[in-house]
């Protein structure tokens, strides 16, 4: 889609000038913010970050490969053409909005306190059954990643899926204004990032910004089980949504999950969904999902609702999930052997908040045998942090955890109120924990059948999982994790 804009149109849109009048002779097919990923006919956006400045890498661009850059300060020694602008980030956002306005692809947007990245990945998988699909890579969902998704969209894209994240109020409104989605979903309202807010209501307000820039006739997809459903429904209507679909286990859900049974290779799900214009008649579909944690079942219902909102066949979409397996860091299981003892690792180390932590513990409880956990601090909880961590003590007692390795000051404080029979080992950070992890596990392995690793990315839980898979799993599993991380 970037190729629809000539170099001069790029300059006009961004209110910029090509350095020394050197205007490229060809158009660009995509933008990058990492010079190492640059390919032929691509445009490098030189951004100034906290630790790196993209302007330092302009000299690496190759004009012979039709590469150029958008810059704030030109590099006279660079051979590639440079478009000088006041703000490289603002230029990226302007170009992305122009692409969003020009595309004929159906534009999907989704956000939520938990589950948005996994739901995005499921939706992406489903949509590929119907045509070329372009989606947010990983969790590139902020004011850089979301515009970059648009700037990398191929010309033939029929379905565009953008994940929108936020840490503060107003951020989703800005991203929605760039994208102008036709179909917008909220997975749930929960306490992730609550440290930046005063209440869950404020989080609901911020998530509802998703509907602020609907295209005409937009459809909202909402979590029927959520406490804030009625509020979100009203917000979507006020924003001009012409249609609202709900998902969940609630009897009034349009896409109602009625069954989720764990089977050998994942889960078997049954979802009731409307098939007539007035949504008064329902059909039932049973399908397989190659995931093990039950919260993925509701996410699947959300993705199905998004497909239906686009007029796509629900049954065809559902078949795409039969091989949609557990994702590293989001509940994927690995078979470990520690000291001759077989242990199943539940790698949920991608991130953590109070709601997702409880879901992970509930999922662990469904596995038979003795269960251990390695938990690192949940971050960005602000004044709610202490209580959120202390609550875990009750939850772990209820699900019958045998032992815990606690990483970080908040998790360490939580262990003070655990029952005497639950063995605890505490470390100040993941670096120290890694130094002693092998000897700890040598002592704990005999009393462990299943092991959950979970925590915020910033507190290093993912480093623990990477070490466990690399050290105690098969070569193929280790390679799989490395490829996905």
What positions do the PLM features span?
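Mobile, glycine- and charge-enriched loop segments
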Residues: 37-46, 133-134, 144, 148-160, ...
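Acidic, Mg2+-coordinating active-site environments of NTP-dependent enzymes
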Residues: 75-79, 185-343, 369, 394-403, ...
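Residue-level signal for inorganic ion chemistry
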Residues: 10, 42, 61, 95, ...
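Short acidic-hydrophobic, aromatic-tinged amphipathic segments that line or gate anion-handling sites
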Residues: 83-87, 424-433
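N-terminal leader/targeting and accessory segments in enzymes
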Residues: 1-94, 98, 292, 312, ...
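Active-site beta-alpha connecting loops in nucleotide-dependent enzymes
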Residues: 49-52, 327, 349-426, 477-485
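Phosphate-binding loop of NTP-binding sites
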Residues: 8-14, 91-224, 230-241, 439, ...
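Rossmann-fold NAD(P)-dependent oxidoreductase module
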Residues: 60, 98, 122-126, 320, ...
């Amino acid at each position: 889609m970037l190729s629809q804009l000539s170099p001069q149109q790029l300059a006009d849109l961004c209110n910029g000038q090509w350095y020394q009048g050197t205007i490229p002779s060809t158009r660009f097919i995509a933008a990058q913010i990492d010079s190492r990923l640059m390919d032929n006919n691509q445009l490098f956006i030189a951004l100034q970050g906290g630790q790196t400045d993209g302007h330092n890498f302009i000299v690496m661009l190759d004009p012979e490969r039709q590469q150029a850059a958008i810059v704030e300060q030109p590099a006279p020694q660079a051979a590639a053409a440079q478009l000088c602008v006041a703000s490289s980030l603002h230029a990226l956002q302007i170009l992305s909005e122009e692409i969003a306005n020009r595309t004929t692809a159906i534009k999907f947007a989704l956000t939520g306190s938990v589950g948005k990245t996994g739901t995005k990945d499921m939706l992406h998988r489903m949509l590929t059954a119907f045509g070329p699909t372009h989606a947010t890579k990983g969790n590139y969902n902020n004011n850089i990643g979301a515009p970059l998704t648009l700037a990398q969209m191929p010309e033939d894209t029929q379905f565009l899926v953008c994940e929108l994240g936020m840490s503060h109020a107003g951020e989703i409104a800005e991203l929605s204004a760039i994208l102008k989605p036709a179909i917008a979903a909220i997975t749930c309202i929960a306490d992730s990032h609550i440290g930046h807010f005063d209440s869950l209501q404020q989080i609901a307000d911020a998530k509802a910004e998703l509907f602020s820039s609907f295209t005409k006739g937009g459809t909202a997809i909402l979590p029927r089980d959520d406490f804030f459903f009625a509020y979100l429904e009203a917000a979507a209507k006020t924003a001009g949504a012409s249609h609202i679909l709900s998902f969940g286990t609630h009897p009034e859900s349009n896409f109602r999950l009625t069954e989720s049974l764990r089977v050998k290779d994942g889960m078997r799900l049954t979802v009731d969904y409307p098939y007539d214009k007035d949504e008064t008649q329902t059909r039932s579909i049973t399908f397989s999902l190659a995931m093990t944690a039950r919260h993925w079942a509701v996410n699947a219902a959300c993705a199905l609702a998004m497909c239906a909102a686009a007029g796509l066949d629900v049954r065809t979409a559902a078949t795409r999930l039969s091989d949609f397996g557990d994702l590293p860091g989001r509940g994927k299981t690995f078979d470990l052997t520690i000291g001759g003892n077989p242990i199943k690792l539940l790698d949920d180390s991608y991130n953590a908040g109070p709601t997702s932590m409880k879901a992970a513990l509930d999922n662990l409880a469904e596995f038979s045998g003795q269960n251990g956990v390695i938990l690192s601090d949940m971050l960005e909880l602000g004044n709610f942090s202490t209580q959120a961590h202390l609550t875990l003590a009750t939850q772990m007692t209820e699900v019958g955890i045998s032992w815990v390795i606690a990483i970080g000051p908040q998790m360490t404080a939580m262990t003070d109120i655990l029952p005497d029979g639950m063995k605890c080992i505490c470390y100040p950070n993941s670096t120290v924990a890694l130094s002693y992890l092998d000897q700890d596990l040598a002592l704990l392995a005999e009393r462990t059948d299943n092991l959950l690793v979970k925590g915020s990315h910033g507190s290093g839980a993912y480093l623990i999982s990477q070490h466990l898979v690399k050290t105690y799993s098969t070569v193929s599993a280790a390679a799989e994790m490395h490829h996905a991380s």
